[in-house]
Amino acid sequence: MKHEILLLGKIKDSFIAEGVEEYLKRLQHYTKVELRYLKGKGKKGALLSTEQEGELLLANVPANAFVVALDVQGKNLSSEGLAEQVINWENTGTRSVCYLIGGPLGLSPSLLARADLRLSFSKMTFTHDMVRLLLVEQLYRAYTIKAGEKYHK
């Protein structure tokens, strides 16, 4: 199974970029994870509207992918719950899972309507860069739980 994370713009903080790279390296042992950075700004550096961001993200979703939208109003899963979800995807033959992380204004209604799962990490607010790190860490944790390894305590 392949996990693809669609992102608007590059990671700005080097310490977060290093953390993301570390977890991507660790995940190679279990599964394929690809980050795709999309240009999140329009002409002259202006931020795109939520609808424009949604259209850009949706246009880049692979065909037949299971779509997970990271949304503060989404479903809260424990780490074990995410591991169970990964197992379920594998058992049902899901080949591609695509995670969508929107810009600072959130996700468009059309994008949320397309999502097969709306996932929330917390009711708290995080920077979009931090959500990227949290996502790859939680995927790594899910795979170690699935493998019965000791990373998860």
UniProtKB/Swiss-Prot annotation:
A GO-annotated cellular component: cytoplasm
This protein's record includes keyword Protein transport: no
CDD domains linked: RlmH-like
Main location group: cytoplasm
Source taxonomy: Bacteria, Pseudomonadati, Thermodesulfobacteriota, Desulfobulbia, Desulfobulbales
Signal peptide residue numbers: none
Amino acids binding S-adenosyl-L-methionine: 70, 102, 121-126
Function per UniProt: Specifically methylates the pseudouridine at position 1915 (m3Psi1915) in 23S rRNA.
InterPro entries: Alpha/beta_knot_MTases, RlmH-like, tRNA_m1G_MTases_N
Reaction equation(s) it catalyzes: pseudouridine(1915) in 23S rRNA + S-adenosyl-L-methionine = N(3)-methylpseudouridine(1915) in 23S rRNA + S-adenosyl-L-homocysteine + H(+)
Organism: Desulfotalea psychrophila (strain LSv54 / DSM 12343)
Pfam families found in the cross-reference section: SPOUT_MTase
Location relative to the cell: Cytoplasm
Assembly with partners or alone: Homodimer.
Name of the protein described by the UniProt record: Ribosomal RNA large subunit methyltransferase H
Domain of life: Bacteria
Gene Ontology MF, one: rRNA (pseudouridine-N3-)-methyltransferase activity
Keywords, sorted A to Z: Cytoplasm, Methyltransferase, rRNA processing, S-adenosyl-L-methionine, Transferase
EC number(s) stated in the UniProt entry for this protein: 2.1.1.177
Family indicated by similarity: Belongs to the RNA methyltransferase RlmH family.
UniProt enzyme class: transferase
